[in-house]
């Protein structure tokens, strides 16, 4: 389906050269998110001559495109706005790859586990938000999310460090000798969401396996503050930890625990949620009593790269989800989001249009900081639209109105089977029925403030 970006832009409401936010007024939140979403789509190349459907302009990589579509799925949900549905659907389906598992040929030489995971998280959100279902049931949102999970868990590497996912999928890519929190945290996160949606406890088993490995190797540290470190080199049995902390890693683990507590009601997942939330304070700067989000490992040194400039987007999204799934967290998270949204609104005053969003939200009285990009737009959109998270239903499940059809064996295509199968039980259902199958396959296979 071809869908004109110019038509999309024309459907956005008109705006003046400023963003004014009243966090208690749904109309201003909607209008501001409308403006910011339009700015986000200015970076989209998929409807332009020579562009690739689903991809944003250089220098934004494939994984960040998956993150951006996840943001726009929530945008359509929070504001009950179906304007972007055809555009988002085309993007999500075009990039699935021949085996419908988000390993497309155009990314086969560079794709990492974390890259694939962010597309999986996007389609998982589509299932949970009852986003318009694809006409082809074999490409249902839940099925695609299961395909990503299945192909990721098949790469679980017990030959080094007693488990864990490598950062990279393919041996020729730099980072194949690194096991990082974003890849493993995303597997944990997807497992938690699939467990809650399908009711299949085999996903809980996988979530626990990933959690225990990350804890055992030292990527998760249990102290007064619960740190989530960036990753480990496989040399010396993964004993050399890279002690950077990134907000999106904290968010992946936090929301994953929240999903598991909401589903299992096990006290340990509640306790982990609270501890991770307490330690998330490191990603907020106290500005005269306002707690404003920032990327602590790179913003103070003005060294955030294009990827890192989008991390606050996913962190905001995962905070919003946590506040819904574990209501006890709502007061703290709401204050953080409100304070940060005010800061973000102050930063969205740059560019030739007067509404381009910047990176820094902590100096909003100074306005735009001169930085711009897909990550800046996405982050501002997410922190503002998550002010609406309690105005709309919680993420749906197969038992509470979710209509996406699942396939527990999705994603393997023609691959041979020799991996430990995922147990399928009667609870693994989606939409109209239960699909049972045996899964089996294998694939080839970043301080409290900065660094401790």
From Swiss-Prot:
Probable mannosidase required for normal synthesis of the cell wall. Residues 432-452 form a propeptide. A lipid is attached at residue 431 (GPI-anchor amidated glycine). GO terms for molecular function: mannan endo-1,6-alpha-mannosidase activity. The keyword Cell membrane applies. Belongs to the glycosyl hydrolase 76 family. This is Mannan endo-1,6-alpha-mannosidase DCW1. Coiled coil: none annotated. The keyword Nucleus does not apply. Keywords: Cell membrane, Cell wall biogenesis/degradation, Glycoprotein, Glycosidase, GPI-anchor, Hydrolase, Lipoprotein, Membrane, Signal. It is a lipid-anchor; GPI-anchor. Glycans are attached at residues 25, 81, 106, 130, 200, 237, 240, 262, 271, 286. GO terms for cellular component: plasma membrane; side of membrane. It catalyses: Random hydrolysis of (1->6)-alpha-D-mannosidic linkages in unbranched (1->6)-mannans. Its EC number is 3.2.1.101. Induction: Induced by HAP43 and up-regulated in absence of CYR1. GO terms for biological process: budding cell bud growth; carbohydrate catabolic process; cell wall organization; fungal-type cell wall biogenesis; regulation of filamentous growth.
